[in-house]
């Protein structure tokens, strides 16, 4: 940016001229003044920074470095352990020179705002690391090194909090440091010290080395007040001491402080590892709207401070300032970061991007906040670059205002203010929206009075509110109000419950099934009272409250799942919930991502939580009518196959670690039944068959504890089953049924490919080939999955006697009807009853088995809708039957899923639509001379 001399006031022009002249005069006789465009560049820097020109006058050798078109970072100072008296000057000269380079690059437009902030952060880290390294050598000479009980050498860990931790340090910022060390112990030198004293002294000397003002100025202002117990606490704590503090004493504001924490010097790897253990304190496992309480308290304190010191022009702490953007992003991170790892971002701008991606900030607001943040941080840096002052206040002096405005490209101060005002206004609006009291649906005062009077309330207050049994509802509410969970609530939690309860009651009495909504609502509250974050959620998010009651009243299954796994409440808030549901690839990606978690138990819990969340979304979409039940069952099958693939990866990893691998071997998991046919229900078990293959010359695994090859694969299958059925804090993944394997329950758990092929060829019953029609490989090695597909194809393409085939199919259907059909005179078993789903499956399977030898394309699909289309295309089913069969199938699946969602048996009084569906299926069977038993309501069909 060029500044025409005519645009400068006389006073400013004279100031710049004097500053440049002073730098010229400081140049040694032997040093050549840089040529080219250097004078103009120096004038621009002089406009923006007295500090930079003062540094150049003291260190003229820096001029040649800055004359480079793209001046690189300066070399780090080398602190001689033998000359500690020189360290302060060396660090300060380095800091001044490198800071001047940052000014130069910023003013001349060589760096973005982010690059300048990152540069200031690296500078602080380098100074700390150089200083600490020199001090460690000095301490080792005097006191030795600290040795823990296990013999390991201990080092100080320097944690950087705030902007230092986030890599966003402003130009003249202090640095928030916390000192810690991994373990206690004693130093091994002549003047031995206990670890606590050793590291406290080391930390204090580091702070003094950086912070103390000398003739050369200072390196960095150090603030140690964010350590545990503040100024009353120890200067350095062991990791165990830190753990104890945060478990017992940690406060809400400290979660904000430690969100950005990073190990910046000393034993960095140990520090980063410890920060992982602190993560549950910062990011609660569940949705945590209590974070807003801490934010409101901090905001109130800052607002009071701003008013007390008349800091409205403070672009950091004042209205619409940097702090509000940081608090807004951090609060949303704290609320959801425990559930969404992508939100655990130390840096502000990446955090905003992650929040937009996660749907917590919309695209427009995210961009507006990003723009405002960059504007404010650039202005903040320029305010501080002027004189290396830790200021955030807009200047009052006319000359300073002129310099700041011109340096940022504005013709005058008023123009800069005009640009600043809308940025701050937008930030203020967004921040106020976050903390604004939520607009709740107004509940009658009588309900609030009724609730507060419980358990002595008057049941008559519930009369006329749509309840068929107000007395029963009153007793349930009174019992809840008198329960130990409610009586044991803290004052703040009780206040939240008192705000939420009338609204919940009002919504429940207006629900489609109020008599179901009330007990289900109380069951959920009873299960979540110990976690006040859920009360906070309902208090802070009235839309979630209304949505919750609606779901509870309509689905007993979802009510049970919410009570058992309250983390699912997040799904009621997620803005993505009403959008398109994840496709197959997205479901697989969501599950596969957990394989990076080292701990199997933690991985299973995370996998289960993801399965629960996505299953819940599918259920909501079904309940709301946003998608057909057939599509929901397909998505549930995709989700299950993704889970099985992930579990196989975990199981295989454990097996290889323990026993090595069977070289050249392969393993596959075959999905039968509703999983294979991609028609899985909520809570359905998985019908699985395990196959393996290996070269004949390889008879064992290659690990330190080898296993015979067949036994290795059997162990792998057992481990897969154990992991799928393992109980975690989020329940178990799936129940498994392996009875469809060759020879059923009396056979080995796993089958070799050769034995499976032989069984299907020589010994399998017709009903087993029927089951094979819907079977598909859902996980495992591609080579074996392909081999299974070939066995399936070969088996099903066998030429069959049609009459014998139909007889076998009819007999098996009759046997199943006798054993499994629960229909009675007034109700139909949707799955096993006459004209039900299994009848349709048997018709389609008979068609495939009878025709596949001539029409092998029938074997390319295995799900009911695709099989209907395939059999119509080869004219086995009438050409005009496709639409009616699809509708019949969809009607029965929808009715069955509706029963499951409300925890009713799939045994219903047939509606006209159900009867029509049954008639369609019966006619399809009759056309193919498959006369299945009709059951007790034959006349209706």
Curated annotation (Swiss-Prot):
Pfam families referenced in this protein's UniProt entry, alphabetically: GlnD_UR_UTase, GlnE
GO biological process, alphabetically ordered: regulation of glutamine family amino acid metabolic process
Record region (Adenylyl removase): 1-437
EC number: 2.7.7.89, 2.7.7.42
Entry keyword set: ATP-binding, Magnesium, Multifunctional enzyme, Nucleotide-binding, Nucleotidyltransferase, Transferase
Protein's UniProt keywords contain Nucleotide-binding: yes
Enzyme class (EC, first level): transferase
CDD domains: NT_GlnE_GlnD_like (cd05401)
Cellular component GO terms held in the UniProt record: cytosol
UniProt key word Disulfide bond: no
Essential cofactor(s): Mg(2+)
Top-level lineage group: Bacteria
InterPro entries hit by this protein: GlnE (IPR023057), GlnE_rpt_dom (IPR005190), NT_sf (IPR043519), PII_UdlTrfase/GS_AdlTrfase (IPR013546)
Molecular function terms, GO-annotated: [glutamate-ammonia-ligase] adenylyltransferase activity; [glutamine synthetase]-adenylyl-L-tyrosine phosphorylase activity; ATP binding; magnesium ion binding
Region (Adenylyl transferase): 444-941
Catalysed reaction equations from the record: [glutamine synthetase]-O(4)-(5'-adenylyl)-L-tyrosine + phosphate = [glutamine synthetase]-L-tyrosine + ADP; [glutamine synthetase]-L-tyrosine + ATP = [glutamine synthetase]-O(4)-(5'-adenylyl)-L-tyrosine + diphosphate
HAMAP family from the UniProt entry: GlnE
Function: Involved in the regulation of glutamine synthetase GlnA, a key enzyme in the process to assimilate ammonia. When cellular nitrogen levels are high, the C-terminal adenylyl transferase (AT) inactivates GlnA by covalent transfer of an adenylyl group from ATP to specific tyrosine residue of GlnA, thus reducing its activity. Conversely, when nitrogen levels are low, the N-terminal adenylyl removase (AR) activates GlnA by removing the adenylyl group by phosphorolysis, increasing its activity.
Similarity-based family: Belongs to the GlnE family.
Protein name as catalogued: Bifunctional glutamine synthetase adenylyltransferase/adenylyl-removing enzyme
Organism of origin: Xanthomonas oryzae pv. oryzae (strain MAFF 311018)
Phylogenetic lineage: Bacteria, Pseudomonadati, Pseudomonadota, Gammaproteobacteria, Lysobacterales
Gene that specifies this protein: glnE
């Amino acid at each position: 940016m060029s500044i025409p001399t005519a645009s400068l006031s006389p006073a400013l022009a004279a100031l710049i001229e004097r500053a440049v002249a002073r730098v010229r005069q400081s140049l040694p006789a032997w040093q050549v003044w840089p040529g080219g465009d250097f004078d103009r560049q120096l004038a621009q820097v002089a406009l923006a920074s007295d500090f930079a020109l003062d540094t150049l006058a003291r260190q003229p050798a820096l001029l040649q470095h800055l004359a480079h078109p793209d001046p690189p970072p300066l070399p780090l100072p080398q602190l001689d352990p033998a000359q500690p008296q020189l360290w302060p000057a060396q660090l300060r000269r380095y800091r001044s020179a490198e800071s001047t380079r940052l000014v130069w690059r910023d003013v001349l437009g060589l760096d973005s705002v982010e690059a300048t902030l990152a540069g200031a952060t690296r500078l602080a880290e380098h100074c700390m690391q150089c200083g600490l390294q020199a001090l460690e050598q000095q301490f080792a000479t005097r006191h030795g090194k600290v040795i823990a009980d296990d013999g390991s050498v201990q080092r100080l860990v320097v944690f950087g909090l705030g902007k230092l931790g986030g890599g966003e340090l402003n130009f003249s910022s202090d640095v928030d440091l916390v000192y810690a060390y991994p373990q206690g112990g004693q130093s091994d030198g002549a003047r031995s010290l206990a670890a606590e004293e050793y590291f406290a002294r080391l930390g204090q000397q580091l702070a003094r080395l950086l912070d103390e003002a000398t003739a050369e100025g200072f390196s960095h202002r150090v603030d140690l007040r964010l350590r545990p117990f503040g100024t009353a606490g120890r200067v350095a704590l062991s990791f165990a001491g830190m753990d104890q503090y945060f478990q017992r004493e940690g406060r809400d504001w400290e979660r904000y402080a430690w969100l950005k924490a990073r190990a910046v010097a000393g034993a960095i790897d140990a520090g980063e590892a410890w920060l992982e253990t602190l993560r549950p304190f910062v990011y609660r496992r569940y949705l945590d709207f209590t974070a807003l309480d801490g934010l409101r308290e901090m905001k109130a304190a800052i607002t009071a401070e701003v008013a007390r010191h008349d800091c409205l022009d403070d672009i950091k702490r004042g209205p619409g300032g940097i702090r509000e953007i940081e608090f807004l992003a951090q609060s949303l991170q704290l609320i959801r970061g425990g559930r969404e790892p992508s939100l655990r971002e130390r840096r502000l701008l990446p955090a905003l991007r992650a929040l937009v991606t996660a749907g917590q900030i919309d695209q427009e607001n995210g961009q507006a906040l990003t723009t405002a943040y960059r504007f404010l941080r650039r202005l903040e840096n320029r305010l501080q670059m002027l004189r290396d002052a830790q200021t955030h206040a807009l200047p009052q002096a006319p000359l300073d205002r002129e310099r700041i405005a011109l340096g940022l490209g504005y013709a005058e101060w008023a123009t800069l203010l005009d640009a600043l005002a809308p940025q701050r206004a937008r930030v203020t609006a967004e921040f106020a929206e976050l903390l604004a009291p939520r607009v709740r649906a107004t509940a009658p005062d009588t309900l609030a009075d009724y609730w507060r009077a419980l358990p002595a309330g008057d049941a008559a207050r519930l009369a006329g509110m749509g309840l068929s049994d107000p007395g029963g509802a009153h007793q349930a509410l009174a019992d809840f109000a008198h329960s130990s969970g409610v009586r044991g609530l803290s004052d703040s939690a009780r206040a939240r419950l008192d705000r939420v309860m009338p609204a919940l009651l009002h919504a429940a009495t207006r629900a489609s099934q109020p008599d179901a909504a009330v007990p289900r609502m109380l069951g959920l509250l009873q299960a979540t009272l110990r976690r006040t974050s859920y009360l906070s959620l309902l208090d802070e998010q009235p839309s979630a409250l209304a949505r919750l009651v609606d779901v509870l009243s309509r689905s007993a299954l979802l009510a049970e799942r919410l009570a058992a796994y309250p983390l699912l409440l997040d799904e009621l808030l997620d803005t993505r919930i009403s959008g398109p549901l994840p496709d197959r690839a997205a479901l697989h990606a969501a599950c596969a991502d957990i394989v990076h978690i080292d701990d199997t138990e933690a991985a299973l819990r995370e996998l289960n939580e993801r399965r629960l969340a996505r299953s819940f979304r599918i259920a909501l979409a079904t309940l709301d009518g946003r998608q057909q039940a057939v599509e929901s069952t397909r998505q549930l099958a995709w989700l299950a196959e993704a889970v099985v693939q992930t579990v196989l990866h975990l199981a295989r990893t454990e097996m290889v670690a323990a026993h090595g691998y069977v070289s050249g071997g392969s393993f596959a998991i075959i999905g039968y039944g509703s999983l294979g046919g991609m028609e899985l229900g909520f809570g359905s078990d998985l019908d699985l068959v395990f196959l393996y293959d290996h070269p004949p010359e390889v008879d064992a695994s290659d690990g330190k504890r080898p296993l015979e090859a067949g036994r290795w694969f059997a162990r792998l299958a057992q481990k897969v089953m154990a992991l799928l059925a393992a109980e975690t804090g989020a329940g178990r993944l799936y129940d498994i049924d392996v009875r469809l394997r060759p020879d059923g329950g009396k056979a080995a758990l796993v089958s070799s490919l050769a034995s499976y092929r032989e069984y299907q060829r020589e010994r399998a019953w017709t009903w087993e080939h029927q089951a094979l029609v819907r079977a598909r490989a859902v996980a495992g090695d591609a080579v074996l999955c392909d081999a299974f597909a070939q066995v399936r194809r070969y088996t099903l393409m066998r030429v069959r006697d049609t009459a014998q085939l139909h007889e076998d199919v009819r007999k098996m259907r009759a046997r199943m009807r006798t054993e499994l059909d629960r229909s009675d005179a007034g109700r139909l078993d949707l799955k096993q009853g006459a004209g039900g789903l299994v009848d349709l499956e048997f018709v389609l399977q008979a068609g495939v088995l009878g025709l596949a030898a001539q029409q092998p394309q029938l074997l390319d699909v295995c799900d009911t809708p695709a099989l209907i289309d395939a059999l119509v295309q080869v004219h086995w089913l009438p050409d005009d039957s496709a639409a009616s069969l699809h509708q019949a199938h969809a009607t029965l699946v929808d009715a069955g899923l509706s029963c499951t969602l409300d925890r009713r048996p799939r045994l219903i009084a047939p509606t006209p639509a159900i009867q029509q569906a049954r008639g369609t299926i019966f006619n399809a069977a009759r056309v193919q001379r498959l006369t299945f038993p009709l059951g007790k309501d034959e006349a209706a069909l």
